[in-house]
A protein has these predicted regions:
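Short, Lys/Arg-enriched N-terminal segments with co-localized hydrophobic residues
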Residues: 1-4
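Active-site-adjacent alpha-helix immediately C-terminal to a catalytic or transition-state-stabilizing loop
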Residues: 6-7, 19, 66, 137-167
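Aromatic-glycine hotspot motif
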Residues: 6-10, 50
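Loop-to-helix element that buttresses phosphate recognition and phosphoryl-transfer chemistry
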Residues: 17-71, 122-137
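Short, basic/glycine-rich phosphate-binding loops at helix/coil junctions
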Residues: 22-25, 109-121
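A short local structural element in Rossmann-fold oxidoreductases
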Residues: 23, 69-70, 103, 114, ...
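Phosphate-coordination/substrate-recognition cap region in phosphate-metabolizing enzymes
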Residues: 44-110
Length: 167
């Protein structure tokens, strides 16, 4: 218990591999699907979590996370609830590029990104780390409040999970 409320246990899962993960290409909020390895990984995590008592499975609404969540849902026998608040960070112009391409085209931005400056936003619609933290905190707090004393799975992206681990 915490503050008079029962804690919610959250099992956080990153989506399976995509071809863009293999190429080290920034996906952001582009809807890139799992590759064969990613589908295998999704089935494996579904099997690994099949003995867990899950009250709910929440997923980013992007295909790579949702497909991973469906594998968990198939094993658990409950539906996936898609939530846009679990989407990956918006990377603006950087989406679809590798870090080397970003560094060559926008060296100052690449430097700022690498330094993890909380207020810095990727050019043309990118999301700062502070904005990402606010979104992830709000989303996960809301999901946890709906399931006090229960266990849920949250299937998302590397940036979301990195943020979740830091809050």
């Amino acid at each position: 218990q915490w503050g008079g409320m029962e804690a919610t246990r959250i099992i956080a899962v990153r989506h399976g591999e995509t071809s863009w993960n293999v190429d080290a290409r920034i996906q952001g909020q582009l809807d890139i699907q799992l590759n064969d390895t990613g589908r295998w990984q999704a089935r494996r995590v579904g099997h690994a979590l099949s003995s867990e008592q899950l009250s709910a499975i929440y997923s980013s609404d992007l295909g790579r996370a949702h497909e991973t969540a469906r594998a968990i849902a198939d094993a658990a026998g409950i539906p996936v609830v898609a939530h846009s608040g679990l989407r990956e960070r918006r990377f603006g112009l950087f989406e679809g590029k590798t870090f080397d391409e970003i560094h060559q085209t926008w060296p100052d931005h690449a430097h700022d990104w690498k330094k993890r400056i909380p207020e810095w936003e990727p050019p043309e619609g990118g999301e700062s780390l502070l904005q990402l933290r606010e979104r992830v905190t709000r989303t996960v707090s809301d999901l946890a409040a709906r399931h006090c004393g229960e266990q849920i799975a949250v299937v998302a992206h590397g940036g979301v999970l990195d943020t979740l681990y830091r809050i």
